[in-house]
Amino acid sequence: MKQQKLIQKFIKDELLDQKIFLLQNEILLDIIKNTKNKTPNQIKTLNNTILPRIALYKALNEFYNQDESYAIMKKYMYEVIGKNKNKSMKIMEKVPCFYFLYSKIFIHIMKITDLQKSNTEYNKKYYNVTITKCLWHDACVENWCPELCRLFCDVDNITYDGLKKIGFSITKTQGYGNY
């Protein structure tokens, strides 16, 4: 899993303790085993992106206090995940007709996905998506770490930060507890 390699590298570079990665991997396998009532698409997303990060947070909590664990997760989410996603978006933004293509694909995905429930408004100049149920939030709550969901939301802000062809803002989120 790509996510596991990123986590292992982060632990090696930042924390210098591979025991954390071994525990994270154990926790991840346990969480995956206990995940129920999800579609195959949800399971794939959970296993590839969401649950490895939740397992890392839980493993960190075994080695550090909760505030320190959260700070380490914040660094991982912002500097590894968010930064890489933002870099990819800035590269894609150079593609001619980027906004047109991206908005069409994004809106199509939002209509058919089972990763979240949303309402979408759009025209040629903008699209507005209101997500009313979110797999990331549900996974954090189901795994007893709702505070971690805020970092998933923050990564969206980082992903779209500084883009010239897409403006992005979050007004309310389940992760911030104001939706």
List where the protein language model places each region.
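N-terminal leader/assembly segments
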Residues: 1-83, 96
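Short, hydrophobic/π-rich interface segment
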Residues: 119-177
